[in-house]
């Protein structure tokens, strides 16, 4: 039974008189000492994303009915987006440490040592729900948020990537969403001044009602100058930095923790609005401030805004926080405490300040045209107090709000792995026709239309641009050192077998970084799944995390940051499970960096990691999906020992200067890998068939742990000797040269034909000239 309130208007928030005592369920609720203007009903509680048992937990915790503002605070802090309550148990199983890890999960971003007193700071996170509702602003503020995560740690951003998933190309909303998201990513990143060096774009009907926008950013910092969010010291000023607070984004974190339904348009006001030029000023002001010794702790205001940043800083430091909302800079009149606490206005920071540096800090932010306001203080009582118009509108236990939020062990079903395909169940197709079809398909064609809208060269350090295996950026101040970045996942594999799919996402990211010659250092995960309250969805999440963990351990590729996005469903239809992995690698000498394009004619082509017949696994391949419309059978097995051995071997060859081109072998198998190498270089290749082996398996099988290499004929004996010593399969499979790609006995396909198909699909789709389904 809801508490009965009699509401009287006052100059501040409405005050309320209540019965001396009331009952809610079986619990006696003490009279509230905090004024309230809104009646707390079961419907209101449900609209805040809180389950009845969670609301009962709140009542038990605080011993009274929460105020409306407190209800909003609990809703924000206890939702999936902020608390990770459904995934925390399993995230704890991931490997997060290593010899180069300076800071693992739990901070704004991960930090990894790259020698010479330098470190790379990076993270990937989602902005899925906002980008579907308002694609331009949703994507733009996703980029802004991840950039703030990086420079909050004291790092200057040097690279960005984005992994985008859209619905079927023939869905009426897809073209609009692609245009808006790509424009938003480019509009923010380009204006801010960070190069976009890689990413993914894929289409599938399962994303029709719930697209994915996963944004990655990396920055450089000094290893001895990393800034954390843990508040320290009692009675110290809590300072608001950056842009003013408005009503945009109120309830955004709660919206991001719920499924979509017919009311989706009503959620448009929960999408934030970004300003990249203000963010650029905020970056410069923060980095300047950090050099003064004024910063004790700092946290960006992202999901749940002022609420989450204040609670996290206090809870991590075992301190209380007191805020006075009348000191918060606002850009709209008559904002309520609820709105100010839950606003997700962009380009804002919260800091615990060294008191003696107040005037120095203020002068820096005034110089950059940004707000600087002391809005509170740290306390020693572990309480989160919020004052507004002279009244206390919230008084809650800060640890229970923050790092002691609810944690669930949700039920999950055993994994179900599809049966293997029989040899007689492999459909035939003309090898050459299939190749032309695949390079010109929705999911395998060039993404040039997308990445040419991004500034890939700003800052002047980009060495490899989108279109290769990984983006590569030179480390400024060093003649030879560079960093490689890649983002990968194959959702159809995860759908078929979440454990193997999780392993494969890590392995392909590691492989792409290795293919440049870089040593993979560490990774960030962005786990996108449906409703975890459904055991079959929770099973996908659990098994994917198990697979990710196993791969990271074997490949020595720890997870140092990440994000979980659940409830990616519309009207009960879940997305494909999509655990995106972003990785970073170190090139000690970028002069030895490998590229995917063939370097010259009359060189030999080798396939590292080749199984018998060069390829064997056709189930869940793009050949089956895009040529024959089938998505059955198991995902390919990922032999992690082979991945490590083969990758280390390839990296060694690159470092020794024995390769002239390198490309990982993944979706589309050997055929697509060779075609992409030929298209990017304009040099053809002839690849031999394997006598007695099905050519479909040879050319389109998606066996893992493979690389296509080219080497000069004069170096072939050295490479073969090295392969034998390493115990690595590395057969010679063909030669480069000519103007065609010839696979076995199939007709030779002109590179011009492949290039036209490869480059045409995306611009034709966006111009409305083609509606090829991604099925």
From Swiss-Prot:
Mg(2+) 1 binds at residues 125, 563. It is found in: Cytoplasm. It is an enzyme of class 6 (ligase). GO terms for molecular function: ATP binding; magnesium ion binding; phosphoribosylformylglycinamidine synthase activity. Pathway: Purine metabolism; IMP biosynthesis via de novo pathway; 5-amino-1-(5-phospho-D-ribosyl)imidazole from N(2)-formyl-N(1)-(5-phospho-D-ribosyl)glycinamide: step 1/2. Its EC number is 6.3.5.3. ATP binds at residues 84, 123, 525, 562. Coiled coil: none annotated. NCBIfam families: FGAM_synth_II, PRK01213.1. Monomer. Part of the FGAM synthase complex composed of 1 PurL, 1 PurQ and 2 PurS subunits. This is Phosphoribosylformylglycinamidine synthase subunit PurL. It comes from Agrobacterium fabrum (strain C58 / ATCC 33970).
């Amino acid at each position: 039974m809801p508490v009965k309130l009699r509401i009287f208007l006052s100059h501040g928030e409405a005050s309320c008189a209540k019965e001396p005592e009331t009952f809610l369920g079986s619990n006696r609720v003490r009279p509230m000492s905090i004024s309230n203007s809104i009646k707390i009903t079961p419907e209101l509680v449900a609209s805040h994303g809180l389950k009845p048992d969670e609301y009962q937990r709140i009542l038990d915790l605080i011993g009274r009915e929460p105020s409306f503002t407190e209800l909003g605070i609990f809703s924000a802090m206890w939702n999936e987006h902020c608390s990770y309550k459904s995934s925390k148990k399993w995230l704890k199983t991931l490997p997060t440490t290593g010899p180069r890890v300076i800071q693992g999960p739990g901070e704004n971003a991960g930090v990894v040592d790259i020698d010479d007193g330098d470190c790379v700071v990076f993270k990937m996170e989602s902005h899925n729900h906002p980008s579907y509702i308002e694609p331009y602003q949703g994507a733009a503020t996703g980029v802004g948020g991840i950039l703030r995560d990086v420079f909050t740690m004291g790092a200057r951003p040097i690279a960005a990537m984005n992994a985008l998933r859209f619905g079927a190309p023939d869905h009426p909303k897809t073209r609009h969403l692609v245009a808006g998201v790509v424009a938003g990513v480019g509009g923010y990143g380009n204006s801010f001044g960070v190069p976009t060096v890689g990413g993914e774009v894929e289409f599938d009907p399962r994303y029709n009602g719930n697209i994915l926008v996963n944004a990655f950013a990396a920055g450089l910092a000094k290893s001895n100058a990393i800034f954390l969010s843990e508040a320290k010291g009692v009675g110290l000023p809590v300072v608001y930095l950056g842009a003013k607070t408005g009503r945009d984004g109120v309830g955004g974190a709660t919206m991001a923790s719920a499924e979509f339904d017919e009311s989706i348009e009503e959620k448009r006001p929960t999408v934030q609005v970004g300003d990249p030029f203000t963010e650029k000023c905020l970056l410069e002001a923060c980095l300047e401030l950090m050099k003064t010794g004024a910063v004790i702790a700092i946290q960006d205001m992202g999901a749940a805004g002022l609420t989450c940043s204040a609670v996290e800083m206090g809870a991590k430091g075992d301190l209380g926080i007191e805020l006075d909302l009348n000191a918060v800079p606002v850009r709209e009149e008559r904002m309520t405490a609820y709105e100010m606490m839950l606003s997700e206005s962009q380009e804002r920071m919260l800091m615990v300040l060294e008191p003696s540096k107040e005037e120095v800090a203020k002068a820096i932010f005034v110089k950059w045209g940004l707000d600087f306001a002391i809005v509170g203080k740290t306390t020693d009582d572990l309480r989160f107090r919020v004052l507004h118009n002279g009244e206390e509108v919230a008084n809650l236990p800060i640890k229970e709000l923050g790092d002691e939020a609810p944690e669930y062990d949700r039920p999950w079903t055993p994994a179900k792995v599809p049966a293997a395909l029989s040899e007689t169940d492999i459909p035939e197709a003309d090898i050459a026709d299939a190749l032309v079809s695949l390079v010109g398909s929705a999911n395998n064609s060039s993404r040039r239309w997308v990445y040419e809208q991004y500034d890939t060269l700003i800052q002047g350090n980009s060495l490899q641009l989108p279109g290769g295996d990984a983006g590569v950026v030179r480390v400024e101040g060093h003649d030879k050192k560079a960093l490689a970045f890649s983002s990968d996942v194959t959702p159809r594999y995860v759908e078929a077998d979440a454990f193997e799919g999780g392993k494969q996402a890590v392995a392909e990211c590691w492989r792409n970084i290795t293919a440049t010659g870089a040593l993979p250092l560490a990774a960030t995960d962005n786990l996108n799944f449906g409703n975890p309250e459904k055991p079959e969805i929770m099973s996908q999440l659990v098994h994917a995390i198990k697979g990710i963990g196993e791969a990271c351990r074997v490949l020595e590729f720890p997870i140092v940051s990440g994000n979980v996005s659940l409830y990616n469903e519309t009207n009960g239809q879940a997305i494909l499970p999509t655990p995106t992995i972003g990785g970073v690698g170190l090139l000690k000498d970028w002069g030895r960096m490998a590229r995917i394009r063939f370097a010259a004619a009359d060189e030999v082509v080798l396939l590292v990691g080749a199984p018998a017949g060069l390829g064997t696994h056709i189930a869940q391949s793009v050949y089956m999906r895009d040529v024959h419309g089938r998505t059955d059978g198991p995902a390919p097995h990922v032999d992690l020992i082979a991945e490590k051995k083969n990758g280390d071997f390839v990296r060694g060859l690159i470092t020794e200067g024995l390769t002239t081109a390198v490309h990982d072998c993944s979706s589309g198998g050997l055929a697509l890998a060779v075609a992409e190498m030929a298209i990017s270089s304009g040099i053809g290749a002839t690849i031999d068939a394997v006598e007695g082996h099905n050519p479909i398996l040879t050319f389109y099988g998606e066996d893992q742990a493979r690389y296509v290499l080219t080497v000069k004929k004069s170096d072939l004996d050295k490479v073969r000797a090295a392969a034998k010593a390493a115990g690595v399969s590395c057969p010679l499979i063909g030669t480069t040269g000519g103007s065609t790609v010839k696979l076995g006995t199939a007709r030779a396909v002109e590179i011009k034909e492949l290039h036209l198909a490869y480059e045409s699909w995306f611009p034709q789709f966006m111009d409305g000239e083609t509606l090829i389904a991604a099925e």
